[in-house]
Amino acid sequence: MKVNIKKKAFGSDIIFSDLSLTIKEGVTSFIMAPSGWGKTTLLKIMAGLDNDYEGTVESKSDNNIVLFQENRLVEGISVLSNLKALGVKEEDSIDVLSHLSLYEERNKKVSELSGGMKRRVALARVLLLSGDRYFLDEPFTGLDDECKREIAFYIAKKLSGKTVVVVSHNKEDSLLLRAVDTLVLGE
């Protein structure tokens, strides 16, 4: 995937100017920057969700799966129902929930979960979907260090051989996910 952004602005605020990067296929790439530097905007452009910019994104596939910063879950239904709504098999949902330490919470309403648990449900949704590219925006928000390590190992295993782009402000996330390439914005 080749990204060439001549200009991206919100009103008179220029977010990107003459930004070029290449994302290698089949590996995990990591984009790191402080809060407010446009990581989420860049991720949305690469995933094809933001077309309001000057430039090009050359991509071999439009089959993109995105983990947003907001969990985007249905709060009033169970964890398992949130996953089954994707049209996936219940046994696959149970397997992913088990790997994300959420099996015991499968029948609870999402509204009853902590922020970290909700983040893991959002990750489960992404990991159950089949795509060519995965774009993960701050995937470990609200997770403690031990949970991060376990989940990073599972994500790396589950998405092995896939193109994965992760944006975060935390350098350690790159190491946890075994990123092949790291791009640092704002230096």
Positions of the model-derived regions?
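Conserved ABC ATPase "signature" region
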Residues: 90-105
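Walker B catalytic motif
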Residues: 109, 138-139
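Conserved ABC ATPase signature
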Residues: 109-113, 117
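Hydrophobic anchor residue at the start of the ABC signature
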Residues: 123
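ABC-family nucleotide-binding domains
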Residues: 137, 144
